[in-house]
Swiss-Prot record:
The active site is at 480 (proton acceptor). It is an enzyme of class 3 (hydrolase). Aminopeptidase which catalyzes the hydrolysis of amino acid residues from the N-terminus of peptide or protein substrates. One of its GO terms (biological process) is proteolysis. The gene is AOPEP. This is Aminopeptidase O. It comes from Homo sapiens.
Length: 819
């Protein structure tokens, strides 16, 4: 795929002025309306000004420089003051059915005059424009900047937390007897800093404060990427109200969620893992440094199930016959991008009861597992942490639930349900305590653009992992489970360092899966070498068809993690639609970690990794945090001239294939499983060369039974053959039952069908493009490149059927291929 780079189109601005003020907690109160495809309600933000949180986090690098005396570089928008008498008065005209909203209020379907929505502008993104200082500029009012896109903001007001009975005890200063801005802000300051053991009380106070009356509307405006709020006369973050309520609604075209139908034809909506994350779902602070907690009440028609990334397993509360309410919360501060919701007619599948406590206490710790029980206080900000809970650290299998559309329950019962316990147990045996207390697994609609996505307490999986046996399902499950540690419990402080999430998950999925299968060491090593062989081939392909600047794992180099004085920044290529299909960060990151593990030895490496997890869970990291600790914790004789600078130069800051990896692949011997595949390839080449009419006595070729990864490698080798006859292709299909294999195998099979114009199997290609949308994008390109009229017609026909439901980025990429 020829990727064209355009900074004005592709760069993603993070606008929030997190150096001046931080959101510590969100309270969402939302209604989901499937008829209008809108989510509407309020969000209350509890804030902490910059001076306070900088003192509390003295170990974190100083993010805010001295404030500039110059005015902010972008023009101050004319603020709008929207009088809304009652944005949610009940409408008797609203009809309720299976798919309708249940709400406390009327839904405003048109933007009111004067309401400044986020409008798309044709002008390009300028990093200087978006990285401006929004702090105090003498006589100007302080501006709270939130990341926001595709939202209709109706009203912003200050919340009178002083009106909540019982909260006056949080005011320590006896001179603050009159209710004032300072009085209210002190209440919030004390509330957000309550100790972790009072988390239930804290959540209760947050909920009560969120329902307190307003005490004055605030001026606000919106542009393409932000919501800007100010209060006349409040010139610093300290003076700005620390509890504000925003009334808003999403737009059907908003890019944070997808409104679609599930595989049973029922409507649903879910966060799709958009490049813009959640800023089209609620106004928030997007930069990872803005770690916050949240609680949410979501109402939907009674036939729907609401799943969220909360730590509690919510049950519905029936409000009236046709409406239910769901309540979720989290107590571990995390970036707003990890907030996840899925509302649909999901069916929960029951499984056999697993007693994780029994599993944890039936046997003593092995010597290697003793490393899990590190002594010492956690290094993160205070929250109720599982790593300090003795029973949690020994819990091999956390409570889990599985949800899917009703038509897929059988497939889930056959594969997914029975794989979750051994995969969770395997992850625990490698890394120790699960960072999160529970797990929901949801099979999402066919338009989901990847095979899986992990969030705190919930995981989305594509339907593509349910076919063709256990292998693809198990490996993907292990990949997403690994993200609980790397990507979620430990996050990247700079989003450009994706390898810190995807590289680790890719490396760990093999280790988890081998452990879950209880493979002997030799078998595990062979399978891992085979997967390394496949990834090596994929990395070579990736290097050939991606721009050099997108092949670098640490593109900002010494400026990694840096922001403007306000905290705003720009993510290079963050909006490039082709980026979600690239695997450079997965593959190069995987090979770097594999290189380090081989250099140190598995025992030393994984012992270190457990120590690293214990040290850095609940925190954001940069590459140097991992590499410096690694090198400090290994003996000199195993370091072998490794240094942070060398690793930067060879692996993280250069494009192309790293030189140490090239040397390793040249010197390494082929594993036994790969050699077996080569022998089978030779047989098939021989079969293909035979004349159509064979002698009767000629011996029929006997083919070996192959593992799924071996089948993938076999088909990739056969793709290198210039011609394969229809007879050979038919024999291939019959020998390996290719139409029934997993999606990875079927993808390569479809490539063979397209390359050799095997018309008898075109139905398999059509099926793949419709049912395996997470993997089908490149197949569209191959159909068009062939310049075969029938194949191009097939591609356009499939796209016409699926484009309305297809993921937006995928549809954009495919449309550019077809037209």
């Amino acid at each position: 795929m020829d990727i064209q780079l355009d900074p004005a189109r592709d760069d993603l601005p993070l606008m929030a002025n997190t150096s001046h003020i931080l959101v510590k907690h969100y309270v969402l109160d939302l209604d989901v309306d499937f008829e209008s495809q809108v989510i509407e309600g309020t969000i209350v933000l509890f804030l902490e000004d910059g001076n306070r949180f900088k003192k509390q986090n003295s170990s974190i690098e100083e993010a805010c420089q001295s404030e500039s005396n110059k005015a902010c570089k972008f023009g101050m928008p004319e603020p709008c003051h929207i009088p809304v008498t009652n944005a949610r008065t009940f409408s008797s005209e609203m009809e309720y059915n299976d798919f309708a909203i249940c709400s406390k209020g009327e839904k405003d379907t048109s933007d009111k005059d004067g309401n400044h929505d986020n409008q798309e502008h044709a002008s390009g993104i300028s990093s200087s424009k978006y990285c401006c200082d929004t702090g105090n500029h003498g006589s100007e009012d302080f501006l709270l900047v939130l990341d926001c896109c595709d939202l209709s903001v109706l009203k912003v007001e200050e919340v009178d937390v002083a009106a909540v009975p019982g909260l006056e005890k949080f005011t320590r200063s006896p001179e603050l007897t009159v209710v004032s801005e300072e009085f209210r802000n002190q209440i919030v300051r004390e509330l957000v800093t309550l100790p972790a053991n009072r988390w239930r009380e804290q959540l209760d106070y947050y909920a009560r404060c969120s329902q307190a009356p307003g005490c004055g509307e605030l001026l606000f405006d919106t542009d393409t990427w932000s919501l800007q709020i100010r209060k006349t006369g409040a010139q610093t973050a300290t003076d700005f109200p620390h509890a504000i309520r925003i009334w808003y609604k999403t737009k059907p075209e908003g890019r944070s969620v997808t409104w679609t139908s599930d595989q049973s034809g029922r409507p649903c909506v879910y966060t799709v893992g958009s490049p813009i994350n959640n800023r089209a779902l609620f106004p928030c602070q997007e930069p990872p440094v803005a770690m916050s907690t949240w609680q949410a009440t979501v109402r939907a028609a009674a036939s729907f199930v609401v799943l969220m990334s909360g730590e509690n397993s919510a049950k519905p509360t029936q409000l009236w016959e046709e409406c239910s309410s769901w309540y979720y919360y989290v107590t571990m501060p995390m970036p707003a991008s990890t907030f996840t919701i899925a509302v649909g007619c999901w069916t929960e599948m029951k499984m056999e009861t697993w007693s994780s406590n029994d599993l944890a206490t039936e046997r003593p710790f092995s010597p290697s597992e003793a490393n899990f029980r590190h002594v010492g206080v956690c290094s993160h900000m205070e929250y109720p942490c599982r790593f300090q809970n003795a029973s949690a650290t020994t819990q091999e299998i956390i409570p889990h639930r599985v949800f899917a559309p009703v038509c897929l329950t059988g497939a889930c019962q056959e594969t997914l349900l029975r794989l979750i316990p051994p995969c969770l147990s395997a992850a625990h045996s490698v890394l120790g305590a699960h960072p999160f207390s529970r797990l929901d697994v949801l099979i999402v609609p066919a338009n989901f653009p990847s095979l899986g996505m992990a969030s705190p307490h919930i995981m989305f999986l594509s339907q593509s992992i349910l076919t063709g046996g256990n292998h693809l399902c198990g490996t993907r499950l292990c990949h997403e489970i690994a993200h609980a540690w790397f990507g979620l419990a430990i996050g990247a402080r700079d989003w450009t360092e994706e390898w810190l999430s995807e590289g680790f998950a890719t490396h760990l999925e093999d280790v988890f899966w081998a452990t879950a299968q209880q493979l002997a060491p030799y078998e595990a090593r062979e399978q891992q070498e085979l997967r390394a062989c496949l990834r090596w081939r994929r990395l070579q392909d990736e290097m050939q068809c991606s721009p050099e600047e997108m092949q670098v794992l640490r593109p900002s180099k010494d400026k990694t993690g840096h922001t403007s004085d306000s905290g705003a920044s720009v993510i290079k290529h963050g909006l490039n639609p082709e980026k979600i299909f690239m695997q450079v960060h997965y593959l190069k990151g995987y090979f770097l970690l594999r290189f380090l593990a081989k250099r140190l030895g598995d025992e030393t490496y994984f012992s270190f990794l457990r120590k690293f997890v214990h040290t850095f869970h609940g925190q954001l990291i940069l590459s140097q945090d991992f590499l410096q600790m690694l090198l400090e914790n290994i003996p000199e004789e195993k370091r072998l001239e490794l240094s942070v600078e060398n690793i930067y130069q060879d692996w993280l800051e250069s494009s192309g294939i790293p030189k140490p990896l090239q040397r390793e692949r040249r010197a390494g011997a082929e594993c036994g499983l790969a050699r077996q595949v080569r022998a089978e390839v030779t047989k098939w080449i021989g079969v293909n060369r035979r004349p159509r009419k064979r002698k009767r006595r000629e011996k029929e070729e006997v083919f070996e039974k192959l593992l799924p990864d071996q089948l993938v490698l076999l088909l990739e080798h056969l793709l290198e053959q210039k011609t394969l006859s229809p007879r050979t292709l038919q024999s291939l299909q019959r020998t390996y039952h290719l139409q029934d294999q997993d999606a990875e195998v079927r993808h390569r099979w479809c490539e063979l069908i397209v390359k050799h114009k095997f018309t008898k199997a075109y139905k398999s290609v059509e099926r793949f493009l419709q049912e395996d949308q997470a993997m089908g994008v490149y197949l569209y390109g191959e159909l068009m490149v062939s310049e075969d009229a029938r194949q191009q017609q097939l591609a356009r026909r499939c796209f016409e059927r699926t484009k309305e439901q297809m993921d937006r980025s995928s549809a954009q990429v495919v449309a550019e291929m077809l037209f």
